[in-house]
């Protein structure tokens, strides 16, 4: 390529660059004709929409946090109830605490189902709102930069006699900030109506015209590459801003999109984004926040009144009767009164005991304790629950070992009784030869032929002890039997009972044995 050719190309490129610069300058240079700046109310309404959309993320965050708080409070109460049920002293209160804890667990689990849907709703709303706010702010902030020292501008002020760009940020057209994503109240009902975004009614033609001879941006130009203005002819060449928020219809004539009735217009490509944006934002606005809960007797009352409590009480009844839930009916009011008192009058005393329950302080030195009500961290509560579950399990293991030992001792005692000794003899002659045994030819199925004979033992002068069915003992040399009431009462070893004189030592032994057995079974309960 020779020098002349290079010089020619350089000049050509300079001319193109110069023409592009001039065309941008022409767009904001006053000239003959209308060339109006954008009317104040039009563009500030659009900025107001951006401000509304900036609130969406904070609003949905507040609702999501309410869902998390709701479940955490239920978990805190549930865990405290279970710890108390493991550690508390009252059997009846332990049962009530378990029922309340199970109800809280069911409520917490049910809350997860709508929460999953709410997460998607929140994400869509924040995404559409953020994009919409950026689309509006971007186009208007760009128009705000098209100004020259007071002689030209594209955004009219409120009075229609000057540049309004200084009102962009105050009216809502700004860059996004971290504060936009802090929890907040969200848009008001008046801002996001069921039919659309109420603050953008849409305006056309002259209604959007501001101060004249200030902005040639919206002016038609058949040769925009060499003259100020843009090419506006036909459906394919109608420039728009902000995803269709503002469209240039003909020279110096703009159309503001009507958003107050944008609902359900996704099928229209020109309105699809804003209709979808409204649908997403409205869904988030309709999303319900969970009520704030306080972990005290008021939450216990919420549990009692919940539909989940009715489910749990019915399951309790079905389990106790070994039937299916559909096979049983309960008197709900009666069941609630039994567990929680008339008008829930047992709840406050129960909560007082729960929060005042002494528990081990896992973070302190050995032997340190604190009250259960002082613990609010659910992770620490779960550790405490695991601790007391293990303690309770070990105590039950020791109790079971004691019961087994008692049962073995009782079995050994029964195995050494005269009756059992006689039962071991299988031959009639040997049985009858024994001083305390007799052979019975006719016996019931399963019974032994050789049995203990207390009369024979008495006659032979043998003093033996016979184990009773209840585990007690009866002396065969009963000196009280057959005595009259007056004589019986005078004897130190006799007692008048059920119109007969009985050996008091037998009664004492029986009662002692029954007491041991009863104690063993009571121990099983704990």
Curated annotation (Swiss-Prot):
GO BP annotations, alphabetical order: symbiont-mediated evasion of host immune response
Q: Where is the lipid attached (GPI-anchor amidated aspartate)?
A: 503
Query: What is the disulfide pattern of this chain?
Result: 47-173, 154-215
Residue ranges the record assigns to the propeptide? 504-526
Q: What glycosylation sites does the entry record?
A: 453
Q: Where is this region: Disordered?
A: 157-193
Which compartments does it reside in? Cell membrane
Keyword Metal-binding assigned: no
GO CC terms, sorted: plasma membrane; side of membrane
**Any signal peptide, and if so, which residues?**
1-33
Q: Name one Pfam family in it.
A: Trypan_glycop_C
**Membrane topology reported for the UniProt record:** Lipid-anchor; GPI-anchor
**Alphabetically ordered keywords of this record:** Cell membrane, Disulfide bond, Glycoprotein, GPI-anchor, Lipoprotein, Membrane, Signal, Trypanosomiasis
Physiological role: VSG forms a coat on the surface of the parasite. The trypanosome evades the immune response of the host by expressing a series of antigenically distinct VSGs from an estimated 1000 VSG genes.
**Protein name (record):** Variant surface glycoprotein MITAT 1.4A
| Annotated source species | Trypanosoma brucei brucei
């Amino acid at each position: 390529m020779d020098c002349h050719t290079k010089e020619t190309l350089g000049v050509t490129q300079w001319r193109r660059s110069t023409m592009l610069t001039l065309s941008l300058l022409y767009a904001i240079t006053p000239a003959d004709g209308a060339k109006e700046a954008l009317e104040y109310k039009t563009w500030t309404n659009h900025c107001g929409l951006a401000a509304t959309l900036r609130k969406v993320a904070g609003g949905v965050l507040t609702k999501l946090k309410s869902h998390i708080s709701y479940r955490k409070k239920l978990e805190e109460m549930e865990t405290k109830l279970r710890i108390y049920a493991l550690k508390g002293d009252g059997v009846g209160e332990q049962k009530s605490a378990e029922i309340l804890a199970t109800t809280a667990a069911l409520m917490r689990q049910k809350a997860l189902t709508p929460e999953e849907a709410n997460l998607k709703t929140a994400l869509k709303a924040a995404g559409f709102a953020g994009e919409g706010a950026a689309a509006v702010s971007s186009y208007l902030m760009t128009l705000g930069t098209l100004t020259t020292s007071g002689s030209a501008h594209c955004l009219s002020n409120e009075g229609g006699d000057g540049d309004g760009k200084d009102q962009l940020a105050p009216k809502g057209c700004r860059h996004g900030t971290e504060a936009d994503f802090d929890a907040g109240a969200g848009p008001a009902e008046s801002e996001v109506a069921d039919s659309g975004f109420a603050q953008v009614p849409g305006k056309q033609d002259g209604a959007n015209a501001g101060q004249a001879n200030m902005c040639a941006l919206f002016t038609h130009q058949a040769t925009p590459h060499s003259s100020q203005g843009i090419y506006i002819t036909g459906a394919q060449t109608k420039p728009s801003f902000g995803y269709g928020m503002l469209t240039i219809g003909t020279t110096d004539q703009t159309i503001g999109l009507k958003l107050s009735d944008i609902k359900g217009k996704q099928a229209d490509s020109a309105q699809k984004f804003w209709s979808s944006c409204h649908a997403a934002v409205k869904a988030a606005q309709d999303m319900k926040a969970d009520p704030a809960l306080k972990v005290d007797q008021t939450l216990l009352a919420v549990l009692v009144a919940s539909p989940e409590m009715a489910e749990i009480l019915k399951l309790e009844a079905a389990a106790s009767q070994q039937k299916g839930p559909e096979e049983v009916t309960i008197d709900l009011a009666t069941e609630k009164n039994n567990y929680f008192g008339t008008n829930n009058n047992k709840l406050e005393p129960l909560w007082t005991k729960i929060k005042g329950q002494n528990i081990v302080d896992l973070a302190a030195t050995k032997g340190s304790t604190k009250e259960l009500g002082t613990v609010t961290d659910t992770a620490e509560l779960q550790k405490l629950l695991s601790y007391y579950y293990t303690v309770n399990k070990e105590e039950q293991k020791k109790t079971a070992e004691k019961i087994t030992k008692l049962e073995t001792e009782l079995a050994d005692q029964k195995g050494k009784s005269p009756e059992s000794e006689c039962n071991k003899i299988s031959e009639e002659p040997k049985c009858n030869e024994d001083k305390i045994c007799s052979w019975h030819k006719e016996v019931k199925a399963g019974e032994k032929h050789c049995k203990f004979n207390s009369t024979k033992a008495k006659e032979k002068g043998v003093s033996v002890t016979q184990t009773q069915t209840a585990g007690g003992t009866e002396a065969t040399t009963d000196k009280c039997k057959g005595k009259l009431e007056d004589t019986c009462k005078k004897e130190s070893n006799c007692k008048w009972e059920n119109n007969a004189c009985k050996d008091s030592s037998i009664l004492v032994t029986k009662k002692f044995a029954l007491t041991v057995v009863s104690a063993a079974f009571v121990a099983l309960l704990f």
